[in-house]
């Protein structure tokens, strides 16, 4: 599962950031070989507004394949059990929640002493980015660094993302 989050660089507005994170997550998953990735939104502050914006993008023709929560009531907004079960291919989060989840999932096997699972914090995708940016941290262990290098190789070069500002603005 891809955790679609940033370090706060996608946008200073939580909702706009989460919408962009969804788009960037779709780009990363497709570039990594998933042809039609499913998207879920973590049940956090801003989830319903993000859902509304993404549904509007879909209505306007942007190709988004939404996941269905495993819970009996279903829906696009995912709960904790969906996160643990890997229900969507892409889980959309804000920067704070996403950073927390990245750290928990990557370091839980070591008791938090270093990150032993995952593929790093990349790629950096955004409006006007013309190169692939992959990120690891000083807490990243050798397995995460190796995973990040493998992920970067799989992604090759992500096509330039054009005019996301208009896409986000028009979805509101």
What does each model-identified segment do?
Residues 8-10, 43-48, 70-74, 94-98, ...:
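Glycine-rich beta-alpha junction loops
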Residues 1-8, 13, 63-72, 113-125:
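Short, acidic/small-residue loops that bind anionic groups at enzyme active sites
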Residues 11-70:
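Glycine-rich phosphate/diphosphate-binding loop of Rossmann-like nucleotide-binding domains
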């Amino acid at each position: 599962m891809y955790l679609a989050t940033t370090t706060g660089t996608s946008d200073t507005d939580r909702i706009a950031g989460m919408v962009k994170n969804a788009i960037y997550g779709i780009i990363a998953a497709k570039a990594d070989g998933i042809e039609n990735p499913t998207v879920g939104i973590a049940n956090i502050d801003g989830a319903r507004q993000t859902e509304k914006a993404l549904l509007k993008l879909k209505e306007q023709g942007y190709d988004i394949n939404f996941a269905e929560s495993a819970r009996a009531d279903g829906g696009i907004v995912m709960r904790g059990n969906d996160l643990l079960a890997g229900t969507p291919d892409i889980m959309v989060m804000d920067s704070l929640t996403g950073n927390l989840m990245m750290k928990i999932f990557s370091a839980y096997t070591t008791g938090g002493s270093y990150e032993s699972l995952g593929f790093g914090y990349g790629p950096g995708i955004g409006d006007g980015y013309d190169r692939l940016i992959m990120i690891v941290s000083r807490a990243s262990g050798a397995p995460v660094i190796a995973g990040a290098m493998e992920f970067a190789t799989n992604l090759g070069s992500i096509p330039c993302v054009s005019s996301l500002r208009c896409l986000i603005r028009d979805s509101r």
